[in-house]
């Protein structure tokens, strides 16, 4: 192998190694960017889960309150219906009246 051939071969190897180095740097930059995106997304997810956990007791209380409101509404509807029947009986001259019960919690 002559000195010229050796120099050409050496240049080809150097060029190939330079290309490999550029590709490695490019891959490293992409991976770094991906890692940054993953870290950012992970922080966003952690924040979301943290806020969701904070709302669970509030939602549970709202659910209990809604059930209580529905129960009270049904009791008021029943009482209204009984009062309407009582008024109807009085207007008809009927002597019977329907007893009404009062709920102290209302």
UniProtKB/Swiss-Prot annotation:
UniProt biased composition (Polar residues): 82-93
Biased composition (Low complexity): 94-106
Span list, region Disordered: 78-106
Keywords carried by this UniProt record: Cytoplasm, Endosome
Disulfides per UniProt: none
Entry's Gene Ontology cellular component terms: BLOC complex; BLOC-1 complex; cytoplasm; endosome
GO molecular function: protein homodimerization activity
Record-level GO BP terms: endosomal transport; positive regulation of gut granule assembly; positive regulation of intracellular protein transport
Subcellular location(s) of the protein: Cytoplasm; Endosome
UniProt subunit comment: Homodimer (isoform 1). Component of the biogenesis of lysosome-related organelles complex-1 (BLOC-1) composed at least of blos-1, blos-2, blos-4, dsbn-1, glo-2, mutd-1 and snpn-1. Isoform 1 interacts with blos-1 and blos-4.
Family: Belongs to the BLOC1S6 family.
Record function comment: Component of the biogenesis of lysosome-related organelles complex-1 (BLOC-1) involved in gut granule biogenesis.
Full protein name: Biogenesis of lysosome-related organelles complex 1 subunit 6
Organism: Caenorhabditis elegans
Gene assigned in the entry: glo-2
